[in-house]
Amino acid sequence: MDAIHLGMSSAPLVKHTNGVGLKAHRPRVMSKSGHSNVRIDKVDGIYLLYLQDLWTTVIDMKWRYKLTLFAATFVMTWFLFGVVYYAIAFIHGDLQLGESNSNHTPCIMKVDSLTGAFLFSLESQTTIGYGVRSITEECPHAIFLLVAQLVITTLIEIFITGTFLAKIARPKKRAETIKFSHCAVISKQNGKLCLVIQVANMRKSLLIQCQLSGKLLQTHVTKEGERILLNQATVKFHVDSSSESPFLILPMTFYHVLDETSPLRDLTPQNLKEKEFELVVLLNATVESTSAVCQSRTSYIPEEIYWGFEFVPVVSLSKNGKYVADFSQFEQIRKSPDCTFYCADSEKQKLEEQYRQEDQRERELRSLLLQQSNV
């Protein structure tokens, strides 16, 4: 049976038809790579909130902004303390050029200009110690300033080192090595109609305590007539009988049964592409090497769900008895050999669709009557 390859660039995100009938689909809440598309706007004091949680703010910065900020911080501390050293030398009379006084002891040796004060600040903070410029016992406030500079800059260096290590050690990069199938399929598994996705761990190091869950996001109208733009419904996935903590050592398929309790129970081959929803899939796991908790995310819209297809097997057994995961087959799907579930009687499907439409009209009528009674 021929397989269809659905790569990241070739898989259709939105199918268009020529002529009349074009429909604008709702924007994605989450991208395929797991990044949020929600824009936070018009928050009072948002910059103050970021400053109050400075640790998280700095860690979340992009590397180019982080490096620029830290380089500017070091240069500013060198310059600011250098200006203060220069002011101390000026007040003490160490900058009076042309007057030689053997009895005059400067606060800082060899600091007779702003450049010299800047170099002394840099050498003191970085503990270079060339030996030309040094502080004397003449000015206690200069000694106090030197101690304050070393304490403050040490705290800054600790903060910088901590944020660098925390950003490097974040499990975010580990989550990027978890691969989701670009599309989802609906097929029969053990006699039940299921929504199926594939997940793979791209590293040899294992992920422990894996938990995969889903959230269905769609517009919902309550009985009171309130319209919820993003109503969340839980979508449960399982792998065979290991629904609690699957062993993700090989690429695995996760199933969601489309039964009476499923929020996707109304899907049919006819209305699948007409639906407006987004299925967000989340995989939470613990990294074996660091014990850090990571989360990998993706989302599926109706145009990325294929009815009557199944995934091409990825895992095979080599000649020398080893399991082999062929990722060239990971994005390939093929027509399911069991066509009974999508070749059902058309009259039955029309009748079911008619019942659903009548039920929807009754709910809208009840909500309208309730609104009129409240008025």
UniProtKB/Swiss-Prot annotation:
Principal subcellular localisation of the protein: membrane
Disulfide bond annotation, renumbered to this chain: none
Pfam family, one: IRK
Intramembrane segments: 114-130
Subcellular localization: Membrane; Cell membrane
Entry keywords, A to Z: Cell membrane, Ion channel, Ion transport, Membrane, Potassium, Potassium transport, Transmembrane, Transmembrane helix, Transport, Voltage-gated channel
Membrane topology: Multi-pass membrane protein
GO CC, any one term: monoatomic ion channel complex
Residue intervals on the Extracellular side: 88-113, 131-139
Placement of sequence motif Selectivity filter: 127-132
Chain segments annotated as transmembrane: 61-87, 140-165
GO BP field: potassium ion transport
Tissues showing expression: Expressed in the proximal segment of the nephron.
Family annotation (InterPro entries): Ig_E-set (IPR014756), IRK_C (IPR041647), K_chnl_inward-rec_Kir (IPR016449), K_chnl_inward-rec_Kir1.3 (IPR003270), K_chnl_inward-rec_Kir_cyto (IPR013518), Kir_TM (IPR040445)
GO molecular function: inward rectifier potassium channel activity; potassium channel activity
Membrane topology (Cytoplasmic): 1-60, 166-375
Subunit and partners: Can form heteromultimeric channels with Kir5.1/KCNJ16. Interacts with PATJ.
Function: Inward rectifier potassium channels are characterized by a greater tendency to allow potassium to flow into the cell rather than out of it. Their voltage dependence is regulated by the concentration of extracellular potassium; as external potassium is raised, the voltage range of the channel opening shifts to more positive voltages. The inward rectification is mainly due to the blockage of outward current by internal magnesium.
Protein name: ATP-sensitive inward rectifier potassium channel 15
Source species of the chain: Mus musculus (Mouse)
